[in-house]
Amino acid sequence: MSGDGLQAPYASPDPPGRDDWRTTFRPDIPSSARIYDYFLGGKDHFQADRDAADQIAAYLPNMREAARINRAFVRRAVRYLVSEAGIRQPIDIGAGLPTMGNVHEVATAAHPAAPGSYVALTHGTADAAPRARDAARVYDAATTRMFVRSRAEVLALARGLDAVEPGLVWTPEWHPEPGEQVPARPSDCYYYALAARKP
């Protein structure tokens, strides 16, 4: 059971013998942040992260592109929420490692007085890619549990919030930049995207 009260059917228990795995730096154990860095073409990852990323990509062949599109959504959402919706304090939960176009950089560019906080969500799903459950198990063996949720479960996470148009959509469909190519099958990006504000 996750903290939101929803069943997390694809998560496994903590890996055996890893009582200290969350507090000790272990480059031999994959990290979700470093895996994401690898998918984004970054430099801050180790062989264990690359191996785990390759396993994930075997299940989800578009994962590198999905990570890039997911990151682009974060930038678009922050830019919109700061410049259009008046949000002044964006918060990026599960941000991964620092990379170009961080939330605070985008927020400051959109509104120089913005201290840096917003509500935007991307969430992995198996709705269009059942093998995402297998990829989630690779993350489970690393330092972070991965939960893939259905559209209804992601909407339940945002209950009580006012969604920004277009609501919950695939990441490349949320306010694409002018000239930005939206894939023919947006669901191949494996993530839902939503921006919302607390009423």
Language-model segments: residues:
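Short, glycine-/aromatic-enriched active-site segment of Class I SAM-dependent methyltransferases
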Residues: 129-144
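Core SAM-dependent methyltransferase catalytic element
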Residues: 167-169, 173-199
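Short Gly/Pro-enriched turn/cap motifs at secondary-structure boundaries
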Residues: 27, 145-146, 184-187
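Conserved beta-strand signature within the Rossmann-like core of class I S-adenosyl-L-methionine
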Residues: 113-123
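Short alpha-helix
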Residues: 145-171
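Short acidic/His/Gly/Ser-rich catalytic and metal-binding motifs that mark active-site loops
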Residues: 46-49, 128-132
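A structural signal for short, well-ordered beta-strand segments and their strand-loop junctions
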Residues: 91-92, 120-122, 165
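Rossmann-like AdoMet
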Residues: 1-112, 190
